Amino acid sequence: YLPDSSCLPEKMLVSDIVRLYEIFFADFDAEKCRELLATFAIGLSKTPEEMSKGMIDKLQISLVMARRARLYLLDEPIGGVDVEAREHVLDLILENFNPKGTMLIVTHLIHDIERLFDDVIVLKEGRVETFTASDSLRAQYGGSLEEALKAMFREEAAR
């Protein structure tokens, strides 16, 4: 699970957080996590309280993607990541999630991450409003996934 806000102990060293994940999660690959952290230039001797929101997000993404989970829940995975780093983060997610797993992403930044989507679930007031293949939605409304969703919402509002 990748929350949209940090749940990490602020004063704990990154190296200790990695060790904690190694203890708690049998599917956690500490070496892989250290490699992912290195791609973001996150030192093991840092603490979350010394990091920006974007760096904490990258730390949490590294921790989550170093697992071989069957289900990944990502809540706004690039919400705090600067624009320049977003493509790198998305590539990292695509390259490192368990191919036998399922990824559920909650986001408002559809344009930035639509290449990750196979299917789209639209919730309205806590209920599933739409559940369809991304390609089907694009074909029905044309354009990008974001444009298709906007067209769908306009159509529903006109009813």
Task: Describe the predicted segments one by one.
Residues 3-59:
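ABC-family P-loop ATPase nucleotide-binding domains
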Residues 72-76, 81:
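Catalytic Walker B motif of ABC-type/P-loop ATPase nucleotide-binding domains
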Residues 86-99:
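Helical segment within the ABC ATPase nucleotide-binding domain
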Residues 101-109:
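Conserved H-loop
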Residues 113-115:
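A short, surface-exposed alpha-helical micro-motif characterized by mixed small hydrophobic
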Residues 131-132:
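ABC ATPase "signature
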